[in-house]
Every structure is written in C-alpha cells, then in structure tokens.
Amino acid sequence: MDIKIKDFEGPLDLLLHLVSKYQMDIYDVPITEVIEQYLAYVATLQAMRLEVAGEYMVMASQLMLIKSRKLLPKVVDDADLEEDLEHDLLSQIVEYRKFKLLGEKMAEQHEERALYYSKPKIELVYEDAELVHDRSAIDLFLAFSGLLAKKREEFRHSHTTIVKDEYKIEDMMDVVLERCKSQKKLALQELFTETKDMNEVITLFLATLELVKVQEIQLFQEENFGSIYLIRK
C-alpha cells in the first residue's frame, strides 16, 4: 500500500503551522519548543524511512544551531548573535505569513471574478495560494513523534527476546478499527500500549494515517497540545 504524507509548501509553512498553535504574537512564542517540534517531525519522517526534502534538512540545521546556542552559557557577543538568529527566523515566518495571506486573498478574488464571466475559468497558477494541507494528519504525526521516542526507549530497556513479525498495514487497519469500535473514543497513546517492537509501532501508525485519509476514523483534540483521540465514523 502506497501511503503519501501531504507535505507543507516548505519548512517555513511547517514552522508557521507550529507557531500558530500557540495563538499569540509570533515574536512571543517559546521558540525552543517550536524548534523541538520541528526537529521531532523531521526525525520521525527519517525513522519511518520517508523521504525528507533537502530544504527541510537545511532549516533543521539552522534550528539546531539556534537551539544549541540557547543551551550554552551566555557570552555577551554570542548572546547578540543568538538573538539575531532567532529574530531573523521569526521575521522570516512573519513575512511568509503575509505572503501566504496575500496569496489566499488573490485566489479568493480570482474565484469571485470568475463568477462574472461565462467563459471557462482559467486556473490561477500560484502555488502558494493553494496551501491545502491535512492539518489533522500533521498534528497526529507530531504527536506520534513523542510516542515513537518513548517506545524506542522502552524497547531498548526491555530484556524480553522478541521474534520480529512481518506486519501488514491492511491488517493493522482492522486492528485500529476494532479498537475504536470497542471504545467511544480511543486515546492515541492507548493504541500503542501492547506493541512489541518498532516495526509494529510504525505499521500501526501508518494504518492509523491511512484510516484518517480514507475518512474511516476522525481525530479529536480538546485543546492545542492536548491528547489526540481517535473516533470511528
């Protein structure tokens, strides 16, 4: 089964999504938390052997530099450089948001003008105006990155010898649906409590993503950064 994760338009689009979850001025967001979420997203993609575009890796390197400088003891010159790097990053996100909103407005105006003409509408070629992403799936992906790290640590300290099985996404989809059927809402972390190895964890997650994609289950989150629940439709 070929599962494709919808990409953002680029690293700035992903960062904009992450900072927007804080619902505050971009310059006031806890930048270290945002950086950790971004790096966790990229690391999870790599752990699942999914392709990561080069531009995301370049941004990851820049973010790791900012994060490392924030963790080091403060030196006057370095502190100034750290503030400059952080301010430059946030300014890029602010500018990108302006550009994105402008693109969306242009797309809306194009749609409105098309209503007044009888001839077929010409599609507006403006990639940044699209920006249609499956945010629910991305939020699920970000939540999974934390679970993945915990399960990896759990298996590392486990002394149980386990024979690795071959897991199929189709079979795991049935498992997820059955679990959701037996409970009104299923917390994401509960889905992975009985997993035996990383192959099972990853296959189970891919099955969950596919069920979201085909709209057999929906995701529910009471608040930003809160627990994610699965509900069968």
Curated annotation (Swiss-Prot):
Keywords for the protein's UniProt record, in alphabetical order: Cell cycle, Cell division, Chromosome partition, Cytoplasm
Assembly, per entry: Component of a cohesin-like complex composed of ScpA, ScpB and the Smc homodimer, in which ScpA and ScpB bind to the head domain of Smc. The presence of the three proteins is required for the association of the complex with DNA.
Location in or out of the cell: Cytoplasm
The protein's role, per its UniProt record: Participates in chromosomal partition during cell division. May act via the formation of a condensin-like complex containing Smc and ScpB that pull DNA away from mid-cell into both cell halves.
Family according to the record: Belongs to the ScpA family.
Source species: Streptococcus gordonii (strain Challis / ATCC 35105 / BCRC 15272 / CH1 / DL1 / V288)
Coiled-coil residue spans: none
Domain of life (superkingdom): Bacteria
GO BP annotations listed: cell division; chromosome segregation; DNA replication
Listed name of the protein: Segregation and condensation protein A
Cellular component terms (Gene Ontology): cytoplasm
This protein's record includes keyword Translocase: no
